[in-house]
């Protein structure tokens, strides 16, 4: 098995993205240069994981470190052309990691800021298969009709113009879709020694298929085990709300992230934040309970950080919040409730 490369360096905050391949080498630490530490890690199909859980870390990160890494697409990069089929795929979404965050303990919060995400290749893939997708007959959601047949679409990516092209199978129609790279999967190890499939979204994050996991945003995750054990994968070039047929434009990604540990700050569910908004995530079934989780978490956040009473926050959210259906095809639904910071009082110090 090929040993992945890890490079640890102390560097300034402006870094080039990883190339498609990284030379094999042992960890290297350069001391004495002012600035943030940079950790580079290159993943291959031989060292990805398929569950969120306790596993040997591929690298250690400190609070404030920047990470440059890559992820495979949801199919393990094996679907490349018309003769390929879904039975070639090894398993669920392959994950890069885990990354051990030094000093992280249960009850802390891990903050991940997305600095740069780039599609790593010339095409993306979309597909559906019998029994998968929100409108496809399955054992647990039977419909009046047979399951839909397997189909695969390939999306040429134009990096210069920042678009991917949809080409219909059954006609000559095609249209360009703007790229919006994001991680479909990003999460930490769950509690209690549990190993959770990479296809499952839950309170540890996971397969949230959240377009919010993109450049300019910060994701907050609850720390459940020592070291947090951060995983990521399932890169998307673009996705419609709900990921209704079960896939986005699935792509490998190259990523630059920054991690930060918030000691003693406990949260129950994932959250996102950017310069303009705060966003709380609800992940469960049925859909109305996912909505309740998202809204109660948003209200709790406003109460804790912005000083409004819970009842005032409840009233304000009812008048000014928005919701986004990120995911409706996996074992849990994913809802994001957000509010613009212009509607909030100054943040408490």
Q: What do the predicted segments below correspond to?
A:
Residues 27-87:
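N-terminal, Lys/Arg-enriched amphipathic/low-complexity engagement segments
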Residues 74-86, 117-128, 227-237, 326-329:
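Short, Lys/Arg- and Gly-enriched loop/turn segments at beta-strand edges
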Residues 41-52, 88-95, 196-204, 298:
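Short, structured beta-strand/loop micro-motifs enriched in basic residues and often containing a Trp
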Residues 116-211:
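Intrinsically disordered, low-complexity linker/loop segments enriched in Gly/Pro
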Residues 8-17:
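Bacterial N-terminal signal peptides
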Residues 21-25:
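Boundary at the C-terminal end of the N-terminal hydrophobic targeting segment
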Residues 179-288, 299:
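Conserved mixed alpha/beta catalytic, RNA-binding, or beta-rich assembly cores of soluble enzyme
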